[in-house]
């Protein structure tokens, strides 16, 4: 017999899809509602970064991400970002600002992120990256992606680029 405290739980059922959780996060970020990322591969991800691996400068397709650093690397793996660099909803891409970031001429924010840090982040308009990890300890990060509108998903081309498959 399985003890009731040892039952299997799924993060998608117990947290990600939970209406109460989405209402709570919506209140924090000042949105009337949040919707699941309508993408079969990108709504919940676990990122692993071994020594020397990094995630280059980019913007997210989803409006919001909740991240939890499960395991910090020995060194490196620093999360860096430039807040409100563009306004994708208004079609203002700020290519000059993007160039300044890539050329090392922008003011970069580097929050303190240690193992166990839970962070809410608006990645659609904030350019961000993770620097190369150093050491044998793998950086492990869980990402939950949400949007302020329903039905938003990665394009098929993006799914193939990131995951090598469509579903």
Which positions does each model-derived feature cover?
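Catalytic core of Fe(II)/2-oxoglutarate
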Residues: 83-84, 89-167
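Catalytic core of non-heme Fe(II) oxygenases with the double-stranded beta-helix
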Residues: 13, 23-41, 45-118
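Single conserved hydrophobic/aromatic residue that forms the stacking wall/gate
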Residues: 1-11
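Broad gene-expression machinery/nucleic-acid interaction feature
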Residues: 6, 63-65, 139-141
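Histidine-centered active-site/metal-ligand motif
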Residues: 6, 58, 127-128
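Short glycine-biased active-site loop of nucleotidyltransferases that positions the nucleotide triphosphate
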Residues: 2, 56-58, 132-134
């Amino acid at each position: 017999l399985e003890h009731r405290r040892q039952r299997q739980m799924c993060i998608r059922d117990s947290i990600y899809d939970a209406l109460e959780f989405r209402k709570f996060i919506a209140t924090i970020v000042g949105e009337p509602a949040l919707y699941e990322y309508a993408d079969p591969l990108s709504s919940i991800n676990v990122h692993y970064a071994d020594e020397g691996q990094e995630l280059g400068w980019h913007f997210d397709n989803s409006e919001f991400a909740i991240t939890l650093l499960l395991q910090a690397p020995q060194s490196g793996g620093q999360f860096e970002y430039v807040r409100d660099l563009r306004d994708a909803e208004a079609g203002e891409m700020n290519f000059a600002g993007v160039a300044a970031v890539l050329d090392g001429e922008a003011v970069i924010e580097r929050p303190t992120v240690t193992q166990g840090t839970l962070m809410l982040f608006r990645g659609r308009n904030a350019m961000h990256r993770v620097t190369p990890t150093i050491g044998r300890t793998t950086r492990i990060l869980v990402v939950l992606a949400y949007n302020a509108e329903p039905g938003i998903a990665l394009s098929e081309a993006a799914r193939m680029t990131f995951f090598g498959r469509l579903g």
